[in-house]
Amino acid sequence: MVTLMNTYGDMFRVTVFGESHGKAVGAVVDGCPANLPLSEEDIQKELDRRRPGQSIFSTPRKEEDKVEILSGIFEGKTTGAPICSIVYNKNMRPKDYSKIKDTPRPGHADLTYRLKYKNYDYRGGGRASGRVTIGHVIGGAIAKKLLSYTYNIKIIGYTIKIGKIEGDFSYYKNPEVFENEKSLERLIEIIESNPLRCPSMNEKEMEEYVLKAMENKDSVGGVVEIVALNVPVGVGNPIFNKLNGELARALMSINAVKGVEIGAGFKAAEMYGSEMNDEMYFDDDKNIRFKTNNCGGILGGISCGTPIVLRIAVKPTPSIGKKQKTINLKTLENVEIEIEGRHDPVIVPRIVPVAEAMVAITLADLMIKGGFIHPCSL
């Protein structure tokens, strides 16, 4: 298993690089088989989904996030060589962070990075910034293309809760939406046209919740649900390399994610076994079917053929306008801090494409390791 702290994956490996206010960010993807049709447009459309400044609910930092592929592509297809992609930072304002050099911001990684590494790029959070997830999305875009090309796998994420406001749409409330192509296309249209990436009818109530927090110089969190469709039976391994364990590890690598649920999740603790168990039957063509999907597409750490259903808890953006108490590491005094800069009042909608990316990278890695996808050439 790869243990490098900036690399994720064993066979399909994604190494992310760069800092929030450095020259550039990006990713190197190693282990993608040759002959996969891939273009900068395939990556750009995913990056555009996480790009800042697209609504009043995201940071006003203006970045075009234009990707450039430097290697690994020839005549429109992958060669099997490492795919290096870079995005240059354009709208940096490092002076916004000069006041926090010695005063770690509550809720951020400032303190732990400073104590561990001593020489820490504190500008905008450096390596701990959400901007670094551009690398995740680059890797995820390539993984998505690979999964779609080989198995028609679709990965769809959306917001189901903002703060205390729970939406009326989710996989378990509306499973029929995921059963045909037309309803899926319509769902994606609704998600992508909404500033919170929420397909619920009560989404406006969520918007008001965020606006109220903004008025109070505060921020909010929420819950994102991710559904992976058409994943074949047999992906994953028992015991220590379970599919659910690998997916949870991948999703927990995303900044601001504080919890992961799979299938019925924590509600399973409230259910009877007779309610939780997904009963099986043969359809008319003798295919194995399940009456329910409380397992979330995974049994014993291995995919069972039903949709894989995951949810992540996203904490409120830690950068807020309110005065907060902290410490000065240089003077050893207790001080107050008022954070300047450009920040998201809610990070939830921009985490959606990042979460999809990490699910895709995990599935691609496990499917290459498991023999579902040839490691050298398609």
Curated annotation (Swiss-Prot):
Pfam families: Chorismate_synt (PF01264). It catalyses: 5-O-(1-carboxyvinyl)-3-phosphoshikimate = chorismate + phosphate. It is an enzyme of class 4 (lyase). Its cofactor is FMNH2. Keywords: Amino-acid biosynthesis, Aromatic amino acid biosynthesis, FAD, Flavoprotein, FMN, Lyase, NADP. One of its GO terms (cellular component) is cytosol. Pathway: Metabolic intermediate biosynthesis; chorismate biosynthesis; chorismate from D-erythrose 4-phosphate and phosphoenolpyruvate: step 7/7. InterPro entries: Chorismate_synth, Chorismate_synth_AroC_sf, Chorismate_synthase_CS. Reduced FMN (FMNH(2)). Its EC number is 4.2.3.5. PANTHER family: CHORISMATE SYNTHASE. Belongs to the chorismate synthase family. This is Chorismate synthase. It comes from Methanocaldococcus jannaschii (strain ATCC 43067 / DSM 2661 / JAL-1 / JCM 10045 / NBRC 100440).
